[in-house]
Protein backbone atom coordinates (compact mmCIF):
# COMPACT_ATOMS: atom_id res chain seq x y z
CA UNK A 1 0.00 0.00 0.00
CA UNK A 2 1.19 3.47 -0.77
CA UNK A 3 0.87 6.83 0.87
CA UNK A 4 0.59 10.03 -1.11
CA UNK A 5 2.78 9.97 -4.17
CA UNK A 6 3.91 13.60 -3.95
CA UNK A 7 7.53 12.80 -2.87
CA UNK A 8 10.50 14.30 -4.58
CA UNK A 9 8.55 17.00 -6.40
CA UNK A 10 7.29 18.63 -3.25
CA UNK A 11 10.76 19.43 -2.07
CA UNK A 12 12.27 20.30 -5.44
CA UNK A 13 9.45 22.20 -7.17
CA UNK A 14 8.83 25.14 -4.83
CA UNK A 15 12.53 25.92 -4.56
CA UNK A 16 12.67 26.47 -8.32
CA UNK A 17 9.33 28.23 -8.64
CA UNK A 18 9.05 31.76 -10.01
CA UNK A 19 5.93 33.66 -11.07
CA UNK A 20 5.57 31.09 -13.87
CA UNK A 21 4.40 27.46 -13.64
CA UNK A 22 6.60 24.61 -12.48
CA UNK A 23 6.07 21.12 -13.89
CA UNK A 24 7.34 18.00 -12.17
CA UNK A 25 7.26 14.24 -12.45
CA UNK A 26 9.02 11.09 -11.39
CA UNK A 27 8.71 7.55 -10.21
CA UNK A 28 9.38 5.10 -7.40
CA UNK A 29 10.47 1.48 -7.75
CA UNK A 30 10.57 -1.19 -5.02
CA UNK A 31 8.38 -4.28 -4.68
CA UNK A 32 5.66 -1.78 -5.52
CA UNK A 33 6.00 0.99 -8.09
CA UNK A 34 4.31 4.18 -9.23
CA UNK A 35 4.78 7.26 -11.40
CA UNK A 36 3.46 10.81 -10.98
CA UNK A 37 3.24 14.10 -12.87
CA UNK A 38 1.95 17.51 -11.85
CA UNK A 39 2.38 21.26 -11.87
CA UNK A 40 2.52 24.22 -9.52
CA UNK A 41 0.60 27.07 -11.16
CA UNK A 42 0.68 30.57 -9.59
CA UNK A 43 -2.67 32.35 -9.50
CA UNK A 44 -3.08 35.89 -10.89
CA UNK A 45 -1.42 38.48 -8.67
CA UNK A 46 1.14 36.10 -7.18
CA UNK A 47 4.73 37.29 -6.80
CA UNK A 48 7.80 35.11 -7.47
CA UNK A 49 7.70 32.27 -4.91
CA UNK A 50 4.98 34.14 -2.99
CA UNK A 51 1.20 34.07 -2.80
CA UNK A 52 -1.40 31.59 -3.95
CA UNK A 53 -1.03 28.75 -6.44
CA UNK A 54 -2.84 25.57 -7.45
CA UNK A 55 -1.15 22.17 -7.62
CA UNK A 56 -2.75 19.39 -9.72
CA UNK A 57 -1.11 15.95 -9.54
CA UNK A 58 -1.88 12.65 -11.26
CA UNK A 59 -0.31 9.33 -10.28
CA UNK A 60 -0.71 5.63 -10.97
CA UNK A 61 0.96 2.43 -9.86
CA UNK A 62 0.68 -1.03 -8.39
CA UNK A 63 1.53 -2.84 -5.17
CA UNK A 64 0.95 -6.19 -3.52
CA UNK A 65 0.56 -7.34 0.07
CA UNK A 66 -0.41 -10.35 2.13
CA UNK A 67 -3.63 -10.67 4.14
CA UNK A 68 -4.55 -13.82 6.10
CA UNK A 69 -2.10 -15.97 4.12
CA UNK A 70 -3.48 -14.65 0.81
CA UNK A 71 -1.51 -12.55 -1.68
CA UNK A 72 -3.41 -9.51 -2.94
CA UNK A 73 -2.41 -7.34 -5.90
CA UNK A 74 -3.63 -3.77 -6.29
CA UNK A 75 -3.61 -1.23 -9.13
CA UNK A 76 -4.42 2.40 -8.40
CA UNK A 77 -4.80 5.87 -9.86
CA UNK A 78 -4.88 9.14 -7.90
CA UNK A 79 -5.99 12.61 -9.02
CA UNK A 80 -5.23 15.47 -6.65
CA UNK A 81 -5.87 19.21 -6.64
CA UNK A 82 -4.60 21.52 -3.88
CA UNK A 83 -4.67 25.24 -3.18
CA UNK A 84 -1.18 26.28 -2.05
CA UNK A 85 -0.05 29.33 -0.07
CA UNK A 86 3.64 30.02 -0.80
CA UNK A 87 6.12 31.96 1.33
CA UNK A 88 9.83 32.39 0.67
CA UNK A 89 12.92 34.45 1.39
CA UNK A 90 16.67 34.20 1.85
CA UNK A 91 15.92 31.81 4.71
CA UNK A 92 14.19 29.26 2.43
CA UNK A 93 10.55 28.59 1.60
CA UNK A 94 7.32 27.29 3.13
CA UNK A 95 4.20 25.98 1.37
CA UNK A 96 0.87 25.29 3.08
CA UNK A 97 -1.75 23.40 1.07
CA UNK A 98 -5.25 21.96 1.32
CA UNK A 99 -7.26 20.14 -1.29
CA UNK A 100 -9.01 17.01 -2.46
CA UNK A 101 -8.00 13.68 -3.95
CA UNK A 102 -9.92 11.14 -5.99
CA UNK A 103 -8.47 7.63 -5.84
CA UNK A 104 -9.51 4.38 -7.48
CA UNK A 105 -7.93 1.11 -6.32
CA UNK A 106 -8.64 -2.23 -7.96
CA UNK A 107 -7.82 -5.33 -5.86
CA UNK A 108 -7.22 -8.83 -7.20
CA UNK A 109 -9.54 -10.16 -4.48
CA UNK A 110 -11.89 -8.46 -1.98
CA UNK A 111 -10.30 -7.11 1.22
CA UNK A 112 -12.70 -5.43 3.69
CA UNK A 113 -9.72 -4.18 5.72
CA UNK A 114 -8.32 -2.13 2.83
CA UNK A 115 -9.94 1.32 2.99
CA UNK A 116 -8.50 2.21 -0.40
CA UNK A 117 -10.56 -0.31 -2.38
CA UNK A 118 -12.81 1.18 -5.05
CA UNK A 119 -13.27 4.81 -6.01
CA UNK A 120 -13.51 7.54 -3.38
CA UNK A 121 -12.91 11.21 -2.63
CA UNK A 122 -10.83 12.39 0.30
CA UNK A 123 -9.80 15.72 1.82
CA UNK A 124 -6.10 16.32 2.37
CA UNK A 125 -3.66 18.85 3.83
CA UNK A 126 0.09 19.19 3.38
CA UNK A 127 3.08 21.31 4.35
CA UNK A 128 6.50 21.43 2.73
CA UNK A 129 9.51 23.69 2.90
CA UNK A 130 13.24 24.06 3.29
CA UNK A 131 15.69 26.02 5.40
CA UNK A 132 18.91 27.30 3.82
CA UNK A 133 22.15 27.61 5.82
CA UNK A 134 25.14 28.27 3.59
CA UNK A 135 25.89 25.13 1.60
CA UNK A 136 23.39 23.15 3.68
CA UNK A 137 19.68 22.70 3.01
CA UNK A 138 17.25 20.95 5.35
CA UNK A 139 13.81 20.25 3.92
CA UNK A 140 10.67 18.34 4.63
CA UNK A 141 7.20 17.40 3.43
CA UNK A 142 4.22 16.06 5.37
CA UNK A 143 0.67 15.23 4.29
CA UNK A 144 -2.48 13.73 5.76
CA UNK A 145 -5.67 12.41 4.11
CA UNK A 146 -8.66 12.46 6.44
CA UNK A 147 -10.97 9.67 5.30
CA UNK A 148 -8.44 6.85 4.98
CA UNK A 149 -6.20 8.36 7.71
CA UNK A 150 -3.23 8.22 5.37
CA UNK A 151 -0.01 9.96 6.48
CA UNK A 152 3.28 10.64 4.74
CA UNK A 153 6.32 12.38 6.28
CA UNK A 154 9.61 12.96 4.48
CA UNK A 155 12.74 14.79 5.59
CA UNK A 156 16.08 15.42 3.94
CA UNK A 157 19.41 17.12 4.59
CA UNK A 158 21.73 17.94 1.67
CA UNK A 159 24.94 19.87 1.14
CA UNK A 160 26.02 21.64 -2.06
CA UNK A 161 29.33 20.24 -3.31
CA UNK A 162 29.56 21.81 -6.78
CA UNK A 163 28.71 25.26 -8.21
CA UNK A 164 26.34 23.66 -10.76
CA UNK A 165 23.85 22.80 -8.03
CA UNK A 166 25.08 19.29 -7.23
CA UNK A 167 23.93 18.37 -3.72
CA UNK A 168 24.47 15.18 -1.74
CA UNK A 169 22.62 14.06 1.35
CA UNK A 170 20.23 11.72 3.10
CA UNK A 171 16.46 11.29 3.17
CA UNK A 172 14.11 9.52 5.54
CA UNK A 173 10.44 8.64 5.01
CA UNK A 174 7.66 7.49 7.33
CA UNK A 175 4.31 6.53 5.81
CA UNK A 176 1.22 4.51 6.57
CA UNK A 177 -2.44 4.31 7.54
CA UNK A 178 -4.31 2.20 10.14
CA UNK A 179 -3.55 -0.99 8.18
CA UNK A 180 0.19 -0.60 7.48
CA UNK A 181 3.34 1.40 8.15
CA UNK A 182 6.72 1.71 6.43
CA UNK A 183 10.01 3.48 7.13
CA UNK A 184 12.69 4.34 4.57
CA UNK A 185 16.25 5.66 4.67
CA UNK A 186 18.28 6.52 1.59
CA UNK A 187 21.07 8.50 -0.05
CA UNK A 188 20.07 11.47 -2.22
CA UNK A 189 21.75 13.16 -5.19
CA UNK A 190 20.30 16.36 -6.70
CA UNK A 191 21.70 18.41 -9.58
CA UNK A 192 20.69 21.08 -12.10
CA UNK A 193 21.55 20.10 -15.69
CA UNK A 194 20.30 23.53 -16.85
CA UNK A 195 18.89 26.69 -15.33
CA UNK A 196 15.45 26.11 -13.86
CA UNK A 197 15.69 22.32 -13.96
CA UNK A 198 16.49 19.96 -11.11
CA UNK A 199 16.93 16.18 -11.17
CA UNK A 200 16.83 14.13 -7.98
CA UNK A 201 17.81 10.49 -7.52
CA UNK A 202 17.61 8.58 -4.24
CA UNK A 203 18.53 4.99 -3.41
CA UNK A 204 17.99 3.26 -0.10
CA UNK A 205 16.16 0.66 1.93
CA UNK A 206 12.58 0.45 3.16
CA UNK A 207 11.24 -1.58 6.08
CA UNK A 208 7.63 -2.59 6.68
CA UNK A 209 5.26 -5.54 6.81
CA UNK A 210 8.03 -7.63 8.41
CA UNK A 211 10.35 -7.30 5.42
CA UNK A 212 13.10 -5.01 4.13
CA UNK A 213 13.58 -4.06 0.48
CA UNK A 214 15.68 -1.67 -1.63
CA UNK A 215 14.10 1.26 -3.46
CA UNK A 216 14.95 3.72 -6.21
CA UNK A 217 13.23 7.10 -6.64
CA UNK A 218 13.70 9.63 -9.45
CA UNK A 219 12.23 13.14 -9.61
CA UNK A 220 12.41 15.98 -12.14
CA UNK A 221 11.14 19.56 -11.87
CA UNK A 222 11.29 22.38 -14.41
CA UNK A 223 10.32 26.04 -14.02
CA UNK A 224 9.46 28.29 -16.96
Which residues does each predicted region cover?
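Cleavable N-terminal export/targeting peptides
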Residues: 1-20, 91, 224
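Intrinsically disordered, low-complexity segments enriched in Gly and acidic/Ser/Thr residues
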Residues: 150-183
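Short loop/turn motifs that connect adjacent beta-strands in outer-membrane beta-barrel proteins
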Residues: 16-20, 43-53, 88-94, 132-137, ...
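Outer-membrane beta-barrel proteins and related beta-barrel translocases across Gram-negative bacteria
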Residues: 19-31, 37-44, 86, 99-103, ...
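Outer-membrane pore/translocation modules
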Residues: 30, 53-150, 170-174, 203-205, ...
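Residue-level signature of outer-membrane beta-barrel architecture
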Residues: 41-43, 85-87, 127-131, 144, ...
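Short glycine/proline- and aromatic-enriched beta-strand/turn motifs that initiate or cap beta-hairpins
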Residues: 14-68, 215, 222-224
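Outer-membrane beta-barrel "beta-signal"
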Residues: 123, 187-191, 211-224
Amino acid sequence: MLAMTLISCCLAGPALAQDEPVVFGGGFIADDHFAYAGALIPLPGAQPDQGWAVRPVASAGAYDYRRNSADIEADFINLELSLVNRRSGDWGYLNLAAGARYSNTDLSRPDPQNRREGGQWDGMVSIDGARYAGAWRVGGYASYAFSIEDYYIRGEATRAVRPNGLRLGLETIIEGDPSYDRQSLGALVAFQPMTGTEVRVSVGGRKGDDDTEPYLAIGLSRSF
